Amino acid sequence: MDLSLAENPMVWVVVRTEGGAEQFVGQQHTDLDITFIPFFAEKEAAQDGLHRLKREKGRRYEVQAVRFRELARDAARHGFLLFHTAADGHILNKIDPHTVA
């Protein structure tokens, strides 16, 4: 799927629920000291990608849709990059959320 981020589409992310609060699931690349939130263009890709993410045992994870700009605002506020990711874990695009209008 070709994803036009300028149109503020719905994208799919993995969300963790803890104590009734939902939180986007971020990942960390320790060698490069990068923290990022993977997002997917399609629900099926996110469901497949969920199993490739590092997760904590005993936590509840699910795939949810969110507007791209809302995700970008939250990522910028918490110091994360955004990685448009394929179902197989391949990174399609790296985005600095501070550059999103």
Where are these regions (language model features)?
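Conserved NAD+-utilizing ADP-ribose enzyme module
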Residues: 1-101
